[in-house]
Structures are given as structure tokens and as C-alpha cells.
Swiss-Prot record:
One Pfam family hit: Ribosomal_L36
Assembly behavior: Component of the chloroplast large ribosomal subunit (LSU). Mature 70S chloroplast ribosomes of higher plants consist of a small (30S) and a large (50S) subunit. The 30S small subunit contains 1 molecule of ribosomal RNA (16S rRNA) and 24 different proteins. The 50S large subunit contains 3 rRNA molecules (23S, 5S and 4.5S rRNA) and 33 different proteins.
Disulfide bonds: none
Native species: Spinacia oleracea
Protein's name in the database: Large ribosomal subunit protein bL36c
Organism ancestry: Eukaryota, Viridiplantae, Streptophyta, Embryophyta, Tracheophyta
One GO cellular component term noted in the UniProt record for this chain: ribosome
Alphabetical list of PANTHER family matching this protein: 50S RIBOSOMAL PROTEIN L36, CHLOROPLASTIC, LARGE RIBOSOMAL SUBUNIT PROTEIN BL36C
Family according to the record: Belongs to the bacterial ribosomal protein bL36 family.
Example GO biological process: translation
One Gene Ontology MF term: structural constituent of ribosome
Annotated gene: rpl36
Amino acid sequence: MKIRASVRPICEKCRLIRRRGRIIVICSNPKHKQRQG
């Protein structure tokens, strides 16, 4: 999980989701997991 100021999808399987006011990227590739900090 990477904590970033700007979150963007890396590949076509990345999905942007809003959880508890935070933007999260979930993907089949675990390296692409991101959260806005």
C-alpha cells in the first residue's frame, strides 16, 4: 500500500474507490494499491 498525495490508476485493472472519505486504488496487482494520505 502506497500512501500518496495524488492517487491515479496505473493500469487498466486499477479501480478508484472512495472509502471513509479517502480515495483508494485497488487492483489485481498488489503493487498498484494506493491510498490518499
